């Protein structure tokens, strides 16, 4: 008999959340992750689902996700504890047929609900499903230290921040050619920030929340983690460069164009 704890998606969430905590991106209960699951992913584990699952209503329209499964981190759960007790800190949910709420099918054994940022996750999933043709299945949010720091000193303009990050590491243009979206400070956990994040996610795989954190997406947990890790490394370099008095030389526009041609990527409009 298979055990859901040993499934690739629970084990993947354990590794991702622990890696994020080790990076220092997810202090206390900061950060959240969601992974869209296919029917084939869960079919072998349905006998472990709750017979009478709790239903939670939401205020958004998520009809585009009707009957879809997700594994998500729980509200108020510490990332450092997911590896210790995944059944308490994670949840498998299923969006209801009407798209007006979801059922908690597994997990959160000691009570609770999924992450308070679920509105931003679900709206972003809807958008990224369309943009990627269904390939993007992960939404990841964390408090990446250096990316947050930059929102205090750089103009909150996607083109400005994207260019600065591209200049700090050659691989950045290749890893996120669509650049970084940026939102001003907004109240977390509300529908408004969820819709605003999704709007940016329609154009960018990374979205910075000023003074708060970053959202990233990708087909897999590794892809989403690697995307944020790459941007955060570049932000760390920029923080150090700024602390040393600023740039004396950097990658030039014509060099970026050569880089884009070499790797077959199309840079975000207006950045070069």
Curated annotation (Swiss-Prot):
Location in the cell: Cytoplasm
Gene Ontology CC entries for this record: cytosol
GO molecular function: metal ion binding; rhamnulose-1-phosphate aldolase activity
Active site residues of this protein: 117
Catalytic activity: L-rhamnulose 1-phosphate = (S)-lactaldehyde + dihydroxyacetone phosphate
Cofactor(s) demanded: Zn(2+)
Name of the protein described by the UniProt record: Rhamnulose-1-phosphate aldolase
Organism: Mannheimia succiniciproducens (strain KCTC 0769BP / MBEL55E)
């Amino acid at each position: 008999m298979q055990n859901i704890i040993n499934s690739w998606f629970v084990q993947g969430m354990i590794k991702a959340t622990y890696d994020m905590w080790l990076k220092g991106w997810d202090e206390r209960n900061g950060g959240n992750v969601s992974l869209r699951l296919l029917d084939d992913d869960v079919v072998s584990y349905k006998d472990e689902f709750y017979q009478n699952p709790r239903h939670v209503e939401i205020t958004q329209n998520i009809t585009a996700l009707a009957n879809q499964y997700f594994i998500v981190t729980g509200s108020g759960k510490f990332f450092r504890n997911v590896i210790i007790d995944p059944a308490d800190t994670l949840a498998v949910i299923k969006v209801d047929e009407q798209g007006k709420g979801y059922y908690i099918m597994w997990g959160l054994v000691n009570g609770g609900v999924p992450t308070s940022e679920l509105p931003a996750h679900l709206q972003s999933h809807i958008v990224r499903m369309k943009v990627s043709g269904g390939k993007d299945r992960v939404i990841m949010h964390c408090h990446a230290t250096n990316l947050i720091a930059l929102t205090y000193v750089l103009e909150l303009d996607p083109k400005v921040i994207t260019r600065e990050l591209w200049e700090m590491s050659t691989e950045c243009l290749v890893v996120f050619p669509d650049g970084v979206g940026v939102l001003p400070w907004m109240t977390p956990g509300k529908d408004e920030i969820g819709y605003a994040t999704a709007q940016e996610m329609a154009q960018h795989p990374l979205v910075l929340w000023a003074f708060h954190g970053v959202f990233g997406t990708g087909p897999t947990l590794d892809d989403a983690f690697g995307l944020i890790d790459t941007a955060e490394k570049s932000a760390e370099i920029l923080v150090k460069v700024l602390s040393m008095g600023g740039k004396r030389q950097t990658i030039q526009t014509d060099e970026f164009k050569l880089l884009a041609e070499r790797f077959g990527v199309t840079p975000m409009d207006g950045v070069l």
